[in-house]
């Protein structure tokens, strides 16, 4: 469901969107924005608690192997951005070199007042990020 919503958001925003023919790509679709192509991996996000102060999404794919599961982090060698949606607001978060297991985006600052090493959702809103691509 999240993938369809993100795909549609990109199209409604006037961008060309392309999907791989098969399931062997690490990205979900290609976003053609301002003459450049960006590999987008869509992830479903969820609130961390009932306060809706922050939400999280996974930065990995999971596959069954033998008698267990294998997690593979996404890196900027495979994708350019993660895209997610929370309460009908869409977000683009850049992939990095080492990857991550889980990313938290805060709507409300922590009660401690800490801002260092905190990622605020407002900095990754789709409409704002896309302007700078």
Task: Write out the residue ranges for each language-model feature.
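Acidic-basic catalytic patches of nuclease active cores, encompassing PD-(D/E)XK
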Residues: 1-19
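Conserved catalytic cores of phosphodiester-cleaving nucleases, focusing on short active-site segments
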Residues: 10, 29-31, 38-44
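Residues that act as N-cap/strand-start positions at coil-to-secondary-structure junctions
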Residues: 11-13, 23-25, 76
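Active-site metal-binding core of divalent-cation-utilizing nuclease and nuclease-like domains
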Residues: 17-25, 34
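Short acidic/polar mixed-charge low-complexity motifs
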Residues: 36-38, 89
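Catalytic cores of nucleic-acid endonucleases
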Residues: 43-90
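Domain-level recognition of nuclease-like catalytic cores that cleave nucleotide substrates
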Residues: 81-114
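Charged phosphate-binding loop/patch that engages nucleotide di/tri-phosphates or the phosphate backbone
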Residues: 102-133
């Amino acid at each position: 469901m999240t993938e369809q919503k993100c795909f549609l958001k990109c199209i409604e925003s006037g961008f060309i969107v392309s999907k791989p023919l098969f399931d062997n790509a690490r990205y979900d679709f290609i976003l053609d924005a301002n003459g450049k192509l960006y590999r987008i991996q869509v992830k479903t996000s969820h609130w961390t608690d009932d306060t809706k102060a922050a939400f999280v999404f996974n930065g990995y794919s999971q596959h069954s192997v033998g008698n267990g599961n294998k997690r593979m982090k996404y890196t900027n060698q495979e994708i350019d951005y993660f895209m997610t949606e929370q309460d009908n607001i869409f977000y683009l978060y850049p992939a990095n070199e080492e990857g991550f297991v889980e990313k938290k985006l805060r709507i409300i600052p922590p009660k401690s007042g800490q801002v260092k090493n905190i990622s605020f959702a407002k900095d990754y809103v789709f409409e704002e990020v896309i302007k700078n691509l």
